Amino acid sequence: MYFQNSTQLGWWFLAELIGTFILIIFGNGAVAQVNLKKMATSETKAKFLTVALTWGIGVLFGVLTANAIFKGSGHLNPAISLFYAINGSIKSPTALIWPGFVIGILAQFLGAMIAQTTLNFLFWKQLSSTDPQTVLAMHCTSPSVFNITRNFLTEFIATLILIGGVVAASHFLHNNPNSVPPGFMGLWLVAGIIIAFGGATGSAINPARDLGTRIVFQLTPIKNKDANWKYSWIPVIAPLSAGLVLSIIIGFSPAPVL
């Protein structure tokens, strides 16, 4: 996450916006397909597995597309961007790291919100025939049992695994550059995290993916809706906390972050 001029920052913004757009289109699109009424796929078996794998596919093609626009992009997640920003400041500080972080965050939120708005437009007939809580699930996450401590730790640990996996995958790709395309291991990493943790909290592991789409839900004209704002801070603060903690731990380790 190093930038030499404002032009690179502009391409970084576009890459993160489009990459995050693709992530949400795939992920929340899959949730809509298996949950909204009047969808031909709403009776699909293995809904949870379908959604988990489709989120993974969203990561794969979001990262691939972002990297095609600007090499080194494809975070699609403020927690990952925070990790790389802090780690970069510790090991190789440059003037544009933090402006790049802010621009990336804005792009990720905007990409998520545009994607969710697009899904709502495309599926409006099905959405308007479905109960508000099910519609909420195609926007953002909610816990199966509300418990602040356990919900926070679930999202925190899941995000630690996500970012740690991203770092490990980056090292593998650096040492084996022609092995698999960028984002391929992210597909299985994200799918695995959702399968392991998603039943408890929905596995947001991404503030833009959760808060940006929750805002869209709040702005959508649906009767008797509840965006569950009392929970909304957990999928934001827990992933960012994981990014902060891991960046400090790895930042002072001798191993380079690629």
Curated annotation (Swiss-Prot):
Cellular component, GO, one term: plasma membrane
Highest taxon, organism lineage: Bacteria
Cellular compartments annotated: Cell membrane
PROSITE patterns: MIP (PS00221)
Alphabetical list of Pfam families matching this protein: MIP
Alphabetical keyword list: Cell membrane, Membrane, Repeat, Transmembrane, Transmembrane helix, Transport
TM annotation in the entry: 11-31, 50-70, 95-115, 152-172, 180-200, 233-253
Motif (NPA 2): 206-208
GO biological process, one term: glycerol transmembrane transport
One GO MF term: glycerol channel activity
Membrane topology: Multi-pass membrane protein
Catalytically driven reaction(s): glycerol(in) = glycerol(out)
Similarity section: Belongs to the MIP/aquaporin (TC 1.A.8) family.
Domain notes for this protein: Aquaporins contain two tandem repeats each containing three membrane-spanning domains and a pore-forming loop with the signature motif Asn-Pro-Ala (NPA).
Function: Mediates glycerol diffusion across the cytoplasmic membrane via a pore-type mechanism.
Protein name: Probable glycerol uptake facilitator protein
Species of provenance: Mycoplasma genitalium (strain ATCC 33530 / DSM 19775 / NCTC 10195 / G37) (Mycoplasmoides genitalium)
